């Protein structure tokens, strides 16, 4: 069961539960008469409140407003990957071709396959790279460590309004995404109180049907949906497998 995986459970505690706390705070403020001119303005305000809640104080989460496209997410991921595998790379940075090998490995056919990879070998998720320089052979790079979640050398970043789509797929901007070591693992869809949380759930389903969760977003493990007053979460699944009863 994906939801019982230690990694996912910790994300639930650090992401979804903090999201609920932030959204409850925002709800309390709105109950005292705060209004916005449009639904989209309200939703952006909710996003800002959530990001502030996740990153305030001594939180491990870092807000990265510069990461606003899939290309930038990949660049950030490879930066983390090289930082975490200095000894294995032995002063030979990844080439363009080698990065494409890794991108192909991380373009999962569904979220369940991503979950199996994240479970890893002895709790470590790795990618294999055939070095372009044949004399360097084949190496395995560590991406995620289950025993390092919530500490250690893992990095925790928050991004929002990342542009997805292109090449025949409608372009959209996601609400809030949580990254671990550069990989998107939790997608949060937010609606204002004039909508139900099911509107956010349907938006997630629509994005999947449109093909928004491909490439680097195919590693997602949890969806969080909220309309400020109600927040629910569910293990990531393809649109035809998402069941609202499990929210």
Feature map (PLM): residue ranges:
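An alpha-helical interface "stripe"
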Residues: 2-247
């Amino acid at each position: 069961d994906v939801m019982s995986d230690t990694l996912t459970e910790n994300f639930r505690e650090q992401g979804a539960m903090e999201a609920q706390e932030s959204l409850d705070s925002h709800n309390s403020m709105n109950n005292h008469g705060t209004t916005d001119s449009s639904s989209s303005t309200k939703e952006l305000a909710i996003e800002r409140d959530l990001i502030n809640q996740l990153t305030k104080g001594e939180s491990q989460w870092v807000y990265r407003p510069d990461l606003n496209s899939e290309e930038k997410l990949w660049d950030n991921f490879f930066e983390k990957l090289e930082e975490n595998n200095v000894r294995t790379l032995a002063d030979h940075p990844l080439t363009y071709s080698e990065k494409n090998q890794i991108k192909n490995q991380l373009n999962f056919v569904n979220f369940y396959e991503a979950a199996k990879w994240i479970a890893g070998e002895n709790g470590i998720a790795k990618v294999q790279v055939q070095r372009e320089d044949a004399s360097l052979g084949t190496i395995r790079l560590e991406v995620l460590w289950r025993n390092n979640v919530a500490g250690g050398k893992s990095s925790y970043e928050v991004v929002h309004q990342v542009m997805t789509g292109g090449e025949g797929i409608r372009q959209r901007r996601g609400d809030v995404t949580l990254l671990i070591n550069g990989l998107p693992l939790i997608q949060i869809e937010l609606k204002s109180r004039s909508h139900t949380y099911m509107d956010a759930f349907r938006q997630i389903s629509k994005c999947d049907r449109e093909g928004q969760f491909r490439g680097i977003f195919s590693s997602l493990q949890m969806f969080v949906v909220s309309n400020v007053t109600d927040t629910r979460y569910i293990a990531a699944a393809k649109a035809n497998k998402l069941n609202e009863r499990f929210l």
